[in-house]
Amino acid sequence: MNKADYKGVWVFAEQRDGELQKVSLELLGKGKEMAEKLGVELTAVLLGHNTEKMSKDLLSHGADKVLAADNELLAHFSTDGYAKVICDLVNERKPEILFIGATFIGRDLGPRIAARLSTGLTADCTSLDIDVENRDLLATRPAFGGNLIATIVCSDHRPQMATVRPGVFEKLPVNDANVSDDKIEKVAIKLTASDIRTKVSKVVKLAKDIADIGEAKVLVAGGRGVGSKENFEKLEELASLLGGTIAASRAAIEKEWVDKDLQVGQTGKTVRPTLYIACGISGAIQHLAGMQDSDYIIAINKDVEAPIMKVADLAIVGDVNKVVPELIAQVKAANN
């Protein structure tokens, strides 16, 4: 393999039912930065059916070019179909970097593409950078159970691949001036129904009455220090008064105090709210990786040496079950 043959940064643009996923737009933001450092184009790779509007949305969010594989066989995700089409495109066009969202689709698709292309894949990255001189992707992720932060380099293989969870990076502002039909290339694909060994027989959407913590502007998060499921009710009251929602650390999830969809951290969700109130959370590295980019962090903990206190903009030393009721009273008084 000649590394010099590989040029360009690609983002797999994940769509479900004709709707682009947020993480793909976030990856365009980071991908644009990577592409500019390398002096190459940022290309969004879109697979689906009736892709015209989505293609324009990708351009308005930073893509220099869109490769659109538009076919009825690609309307819904299939491991075989998507992997084949993307691998064919990579072998033909030779990008040096390929980013994929770490969604349930991306976690299925990414390793299969990497295996077929005999290249490396760094999963669940929390940071991405470029060694411009060597054109190497520097992919950073927690390792050894979150006790270390490792930067992984795939220097001898191309394309370099990484998956990133939703919320790690920010979308670029919408720029409709970047939208142009000549930036959208509809690519021919070699795919037949027989290439797809698995079929989707039915899609059942589960309705959950739980807020998406990844979209919340205010989060009140509880950890082991909250003490009980009942004490979480006070956190819910505070969150409601502030127009936010509750979240939790892994310790609180494991004790089944709240739903697992509310977990923040390396094994949960990455969030970046305007306000993050950490209640009784010590701040293990896995948790910090999921919330440290919040605009303003308030930490409430009895232990002044807890790691969360060092990253907080405001650290309150005290019993969370005494401090939170006082905060509730103060907010109610201010609202009146």
Swiss-Prot record:
Keyword Transport: yes
Cofactor(s) this protein cannot do without: FAD
Residues the record lists as binding FAD: 275-303
Cofactor note: Binds 1 FAD per dimer.
Any one biological process term the GO annotation gives: fatty acid beta-oxidation using acyl-CoA dehydrogenase
Keyword annotations of the record: Electron transport, FAD, Flavoprotein, Transport
CDD domains listed in its UniProt record: ETF_alpha
Residue ranges of the TM segments: none
Pfam families, per the entry: ETF (PF01012), ETF_alpha (PF00766)
Keyword Calcium tagged: no
GO molecular function (one): flavin adenine dinucleotide binding
Family matches, as SMART domains: ETF
Subunit (UniProt): Heterodimer of an alpha and a beta subunit.
Record-stated family: Belongs to the ETF alpha-subunit/FixB family.
Function: The electron transfer flavoprotein serves as a specific electron acceptor for other dehydrogenases. It transfers the electrons to the main respiratory chain via ETF-ubiquinone oxidoreductase (ETF dehydrogenase).
Protein name: Electron transfer flavoprotein subunit alpha
Organism: Clostridium acetobutylicum (strain ATCC 824 / DSM 792 / JCM 1419 / IAM 19013 / LMG 5710 / NBRC 13948 / NRRL B-527 / VKM B-1787 / 2291 / W)
Taxonomic lineage: Bacteria, Bacillati, Bacillota, Clostridia, Eubacteriales
Gene that encodes it: etfA
